[in-house]
């Protein structure tokens, strides 16, 4: 299986949204385009048009990796993957393996530690060892490969083998990986601070302060 960059992003988004927002799944073309272009949990950030997403969708439909779900109304086509864990797919993953594949499709090569941090909404890993165990199973199935350790880094990154990867991603500087993870952690902390501020305002309003 060799997926183009746009096809990888679409499959990754369908896997992600099926797990994180099942009430809104399958996805319409508009929802899928928004998912492909969202800035969080994506690397690189894309700016695909509806037409570009539709072209990649049609290719995936022809490859029997995506199907159209017309729904009860039949007015808006919605798209559902047949990539894995369905009666139409030969790929069968555990919840942990599925989460890893999803993130590798959405963000490219990552270390086990990065995967554990980012998998929270997709699957539960008790430790980095659990991540490495799932990765090794995927390596045995020729779905994932382990990259050479980068200079100055303790951990190796892992990359999926479902399509071509940019050379720049395979040879990414170590500093960039660290900066990306720090930025992600900072954004999560800022979001938590905003939530706490909102709760504090509600408490003050309730107490008449």
Swiss-Prot record:
InterPro entries given in the database record: DUF480, WH-like_DNA-bd_sf, WH_DNA-bd_sf
Family statement: Belongs to the UPF0502 family.
PANTHER family given in the database record: UPF0502 PROTEIN YCEH
Record protein name field: UPF0502 protein PSHAa0076
Biological source species: Pseudoalteromonas translucida (strain TAC 125)
């Amino acid at each position: 299986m060799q997926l183009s960059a746009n096809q990888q992003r679409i499959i990754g988004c369908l896997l992600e949204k099926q797990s994180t927002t099942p009430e809104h799944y399958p996805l319409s073309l508009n929802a899928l385009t928004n998912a492909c272009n969202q800035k969080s949990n994506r690397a690189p950030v894309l700016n695909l048009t509806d037409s570009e997403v539709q072209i990649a969708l049609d290719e995936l439909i022809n490859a029997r990796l995506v199907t159209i779900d017309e729904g009860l109304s039949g007015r808006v086509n919605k798209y559902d993957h047949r990539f894995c864990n369905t009666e139409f797919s030969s790929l069968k993953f555990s919840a942990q393996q599925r989460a890893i594949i999803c993130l590798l499709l959405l963000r490219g090569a990552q270390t086990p530690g990065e995967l554990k941090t980012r998998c929270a909404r997709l699957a539960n890993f008790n430790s980095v060892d659990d991540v490495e165990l799932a990765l090794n199973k995927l390596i045995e199935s020729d779905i994932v490969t382990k990259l050479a350790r980068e200079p100055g880094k303790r951990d190796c990154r892992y990359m999926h083998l479902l399509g071509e990867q940019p050379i720049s991603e395979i040879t990414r500087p170590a500093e960039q990986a660290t900066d990306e993870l720090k930025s992600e952690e900072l954004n999560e902390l800022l979001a938590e601070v905003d939530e706490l501020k909102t709760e504090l305002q509600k408490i003050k309003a309730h107490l008449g302060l």
